[in-house]
């Protein structure tokens, strides 16, 4: 026993034993030791902090794992002290220094080992990637050599040709178990993923050289299809999954073939449950023929019948909202006189938030449809708003809004040959109008004599004015009164006749153009208007005599009693009421 005590390892083990619990202690002693943390009051354990109680309970029930590092360091220090390498008072300092050094260098070694491990893993992954890409790198070099032999530009379909070459590069890069190599003057692409398949790239591009951008008719594509070789078809089939509808135009023949191949490859995976069900049904019916089974599968997978479109209708709540929108929009249009778009916005603002929140999709779709209808065809929008029984068309429910186009009112849009062959009733009306025009022309020929009877001294250019009697009264002398028209002249006066339509819509469809030409012909420049204004007439002999005698005021332009019925607009209109100085003497 004394020999064991002199052993540094045994002594270190004895020195490192904890002063608390041992594995050989009884549970009663363990509980007594835990409860007797306070020697004076055993019941004070429950008054200890929760962390202290929890730590003591855990350590008593499940002891901590022993770490032999400090025991080994302590054994080394005891051996050094026995061999007198260190003094006993230096044992504690050496023990602490050794523990710190072990902790420091052990952690450093762990980090170094981890760094080395990470570096080794990265190097292994890099080597694996390089080993896998050795074949693809060689294939890319061979592919670039092949593409260097091909022309960079083609006569037509340049965009399709460029996208096809890009898809070929992508296929060579991404497809595993494939390679591009040269054998003689030709280049080949070989893949062994799903069976060994080899494509002669040189012959395939030579065959496709004249087909880039070719647009074959939809009905007959057999003429173009006969130009493709099986080698070219295989290349199109292999490259189809690496293209999309935007890379190669679907209008071209090659784009159409790529689309068909892509859809066929995408639908090649048949649901096994469907296959098993059809197989079991065929066997139950006694049809063991493989051909009939394939025919059934082809019918079920390819001949899919279209479903009849469902009939849409409004429920009671949606119809109530529709009627409310119709009434509100019509009220805003008639009361405020706003535009249809503003009326719809006012209706949306005045809508109850609860009703809008519960029917938001329908209200948004309805407002969108009405806005489009108001912009495309205002007449259709007005009829839809004012019709209390109006219901949206089927396109309203599916999202494809169909609003009939509005009629712009151009008469030439509705012209046909029947317009220029008038009906008998139209001919009768034309004859009556021709007679009326002849009577008006006779009246215009007779009008200058009536002007002379009225005593008008108007210029010759004023005879064509539409108001000859008015001009005559304005330009006549102030000493004579105008003569009243007779009964026949009064009835035949052109001013009292109803306005004659210049162009009839049934017989003259370009009525708008004729009216525009008529308006433009009546336009005059400023110089023409200034030239046509009649100047002041020289005073007559009697007027000069009266002014010399001082019987007429200088600023009096219409002082005669005979000018009461004068329609002139110049001078003092009440000058005839002013007393005359000449009559007072």
Curated annotation (Swiss-Prot):
Residues annotated as site: Cleavage: 570-571
Taxonomy, superkingdom: Viruses
Binding to hexon-linking protein: annotated segments: 138-251
Regions of compositional bias (Polar residues) in chain numbering: 14-24
Residue numbers bearing the Phosphothreonine modification: 274
Signal sequence extent: none
Propeptide: 571-585
Main localization (coarse): virion
Region Peripentonal hexon-tethering domain, annotated ranges: 1-106
Location in the cell: Virion; Host nucleus
UniProtKB keywords: Capsid decoration protein, Capsid protein, Host nucleus, Late protein, Phosphoprotein, Viral genome packaging, Viral release from host cell, Virion
Modified residues (Phosphoserine): 225, 310, 444, 449-450, 452, 469, 473, 494, 515
InterPro entries according to UniProt: Hex_IIIa, Hex_IIIa_N
Gene Ontology CC annotation, any one: viral capsid, decoration
Induction and repression of expression: Expressed in the late phase of the viral replicative cycle.
Residues modified as Phosphotyrosine: 490
PTM: Cleaved near the C-terminus by the viral protease during virion maturation to form the mature protein.
Region (Disordered): 1-24, 438-475, 528-573
This protein's record includes keyword Nucleotide-binding: no
Summary of the function given for this chain in its UniProt record: Structural component of the virion that acts as a cement protein on the capsid exterior and which mediates the interactions between the hexons, including the peripentonal hexons, and reaches all the way to the penton vertices. Two hexon linking proteins IIIa, one from each facet, stabilize the unique edge interface between a pair of facets. As the virus enters the host cell, hexon linking proteins IIIa are shed concomitant with virion acidification in the endosome.
Subunit structure: Interacts with hexon proteins; this interaction tethers the peripentonal hexons to hexons situated in the facet. Interacts with the penton protein (via N-terminus). Interacts with packaging protein 3; this interaction is required to promote correct genome packaging.
Family under the similarity heading: Belongs to the adenoviridae hexon-linking protein IIIa family.
Misc. comment: All late proteins expressed from the major late promoter are produced by alternative splicing and alternative polyadenylation of the same gene giving rise to non-overlapping ORFs. A leader sequence is present in the N-terminus of all these mRNAs and is recognized by the viral shutoff protein to provide expression although conventional translation via ribosome scanning from the cap has been shut off in the host cell.
Protein name listed in UniProt: Pre-hexon-linking protein IIIa
Organism: Human adenovirus C serotype 5
